[in-house]
C-alpha cells in the first residue's frame, strides 16, 4: 500500500474479501459510493440485501479516535435517536483486512431534507437538541477540537508551503488570510468561553437523509436493507421516518453552533427566521447560548480555509484532481480571495 496513493491496493477482490472476513457472504454486487476522504462501497449480501462498507483513509484517524466516534453514535442509537451506527461483528465495529481498516453499516436510503419548510427546521432542531444533550455528557479523549489553530492557522501555513497557490496571487491571498484569521480570533474573543461538546461536526444537508413515516412496524424497513448480524442492536434509523444522521467521520469537540449554521441559507433576514424556527425545536431538549451566534461567520471562514487545505493535502490522491480539476486554477484562488474579503466584512459587521 503506497502512502502517496493510499487506496491503490483496495481492489474489488480485497473489498469483497474484507467483508466476507467478518462472516458475510457477498453475492458479487459492488457499487462505489461518492466519497473522497474515505472509500465507501455498497455490497450485496446473499439473502440479506445490502451493506455499506467504509474503508478509512490510512493515517487520518487512530483506532481510538474511530472507536470514540462509533461509541458516540452507539449512545445516540441507544437513546433512540435516528443515527446510522456501524454494525458489530464479534463485539467489534472497527475491522481490519490487508492493512485497511473498515466498518460496515446498514444501507440507509432517503432524500435531502427541505430546509425551506419551517416544520422541517423545527424537527431538525429537536433532533439536534437531543444529539447535543447526549454529546455534552462526556468529552472526546482521542478526537480533536474544532479551533482556530487546527482549522485556520495550520491550513493557512500548509497552503503557503504547498506551491499550489499561483505565485502572482500568493501575496494577496496571504494578506487576506491573515486578516481573516485576525477577525476570526476577535469573533471568538467576543463570544467568550462557550461550552464545547461532542458534535456531528459536518452537519449539512448531504449528511441528513429524510425518509417518509411508516404506518406500522412491519413496514418500517424497506426491502433489501441489511439490519445487521443476528442479535445485534437495530439502528433507530431503520424504524422511523423523518431525518436520519449519517457519517459522523468528522465528529469532534466544538461549539454547538457548528452543527447549526450550515442548515441555514439566504439573506440575513431569511437566515434569522430559519434560525429562530430551528431553535424553537432545539431548546425543547437543549439550552443554547446566544453568544455562539457571533461564531457563525468565523466558523464559515475556518471552513473555507480548511476546505482548500484539505484538497491540497490530498492532491497526490488521483481521485482528487479528477474530482476537483478547478482547484489549481487561477480562477479558483481569485474566488478564494474574494470570499475571504467578504468574510472579513461580515465578521467586522457582527
What does each model-found stretch correspond to?
Residues 1-26:
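Juxta-kinase regulatory segment immediately upstream of eukaryotic protein kinase catalytic domains
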Residues 3, 163, 309-350:
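ATP/Mg2+ or Mg2+-diphosphate-binding catalytic cores
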Residues 22-44:
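ATP-binding glycine-rich phosphate-binding loop
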Residues 37-53, 86, 182-260:
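Active-site acidic catalytic loop and adjacent metal/ATP-binding pocket
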Residues 45-141:
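ATP-binding pocket architecture of kinase catalytic cores
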Residues 58, 102-115, 156-165, 307-323:
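A glycine-centered beta->alpha junction motif in the catalytic cores
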Residues 114-172, 194-196, 323-324:
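A cross-family kinase active-site recognition segment
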Residues 236, 256-287, 303-319:
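Active-site activation/catalytic loop segments of kinase-like enzymes and analogous catalytic loops
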